Design a protein with these regions (language model features):
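Sec-dependent N-terminal signal peptides
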Residues: 4-15
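Second-shell loop/turn segments in exported
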Residues: 52-62, 83-89, 116-117, 147-149, ...
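Structured beta-strand-rich core segments of catalytic domains in phosphoester-bond hydrolases
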Residues: 86, 92-170
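Active-site environment of divalent metal-dependent phosphoester hydrolases
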Residues: 94-96, 122-124, 181-183, 218-224, ...
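Extracytoplasmic, non-cytosolic globular domains
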Residues: 116, 159-243
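N-terminal, active-site-proximal structural segment of metallo-dependent hydrolase catalytic domains
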Residues: 16-105, 115-119, 125, 197, ...
Length: 332
């Protein structure tokens, strides 16, 4: 029954999306090493992803990726009746990459603005947020660097942006890219738990009941790190994960590691979907089925965009507060 209701809600959301001013479309995408083609001397990854580096990441390849990202976002716009209002991104080298994405492609006509800060990540990659100026504007931004065993980690910062929508409503957006499983899943689990703890401390400091936290958490919804979120945030990917869906494919298995977490008040007015973009999907040559069309297969350039599919959160803002209403009814 729950599944039927979820499907009905999603269809109703989509059918009126283009005309509904109370709707909001949020997107997140890990863009797999989205570097420019210039070696600026900022680290090994910067050198690797340059015209003369081991990846032979040339200007033409960079612009091919920019065009493919723009085409993907516009495909999403066609599918959902509007361009994403907010876009969280991971694995971005610098602000210049985003500036070129927004100004050298068809995205230039959509008036996206950039929120990005450099982090101390050892690979030289950051998270970022794009937003449409016609939909909202920033109130303030903040960063939080995850700590582990009393020390700041050399990983991506957690980005927080408070937005004021056109009608004056405010909403908090958080973008994450938690530590990978490099070194082993069990050995690295503590770092992801620490990153999640940092994210929850940020959420607690906001005094807000309208939080949307998104990102690549490098863990599935049943991992230990998500026990920290259970009392305060609703995981919109949990049901999709239980159905066997995912955003990346490894050794023939789908893993749901990209997801949205929302405040309880936003739970009943939001639906998450994985966007399997047709032209960014290829056949898995080692296993049966399909997989995302990534930029590199090992060291070999193959011309795709990412090993992750983007995810979408559909929000019907006129349904905000339904959670509080029903919670109140249950208490009486």
């Amino acid at each position: 029954m729950k599944r039927i209701l979820a499907v009905i809600f999603a269809l109703m959301s989509l059918s009126c999306f283009a005309e509904d001013r109370d709707s909001l479309l949020v997107m997140f995408w890990n863009l797999e090493n989205f570097f420019d083609h210039i070696d600026q001397g900022t680290g090994e990854s910067d050198k690797e992803f340059s015209s003369y580096g081991t990846r032979r990441w040339m200007k033409k390849r960079f612009h091919v990726k920019c065009d493919a990202v723009a085409k993907s976002m516009m495909w999403i716009g066609e599918q959902y009746g509007r361009m994403p209002d907010v876009v969280g991104l991971a694995e971005i080298e610098n602000k210049g990459v985003l500036y070129k994405l927004l100004n050298s492609t068809l995205l230039r006509k959509y008036d996206y603005r950039i929120v990005h800060f450099e982090s101390s990540d050892r690979r030289g990659i950051d998270v970022a947020l794009l937003f449409r100026r016609s939909s909202m504007d920033t109130v303030f931004t903040s960063l939080r660097t995850p700590e582990h065993d009393g020390h700041k980690m050399n990983t991506r910062d957690i980005l927080h942006v408070r937005m004021r929508l056109c009608d004056g409503d405010e909403m908090d957006f958080i973008v994450n890219h938690h530590p990978s499983k490099y070194g082993g899943e069990e050995e690295s689990s503590g770092r992801r738990v620490s990153a999640m703890q940092s994210m929850m401390e940020l959420c607690d400091s906001l005094d807000s009941d309208r939080i949307i936290s998104m990102g690549d958490f490098n863990d599935t919804p049943d991992a230990p790190a998500f026990r920290l979120t259970e009392d305060r945030l609703m995981n919109k990917a949990r049901y999709l994960h239980q159905r066997g869906e995912g955003t990346i494919r490894y050794e023939g298995r789908w893993d749901m590691i990209d997801m949205f977490l929302v405040s309880p008040e936003l739970d009943t007015c939001t639906v998450m979907e994985v966007c399997r973009i047709p032209f960014l999907t290829v056949r898995d040559s080692k296993h049966t089925g399909l997989k995302p069309f990534r930029t590199y297969s090992g060291p070999r350039y193959i011309g795709g965009v990412s090993d992750h599919y983007p995810i979408i959160l559909i929000m019907n803002r006129d349904k905000i507060g339904v959670y509080k209403y029903y919670s109140s009814m249950c208490r009486h």
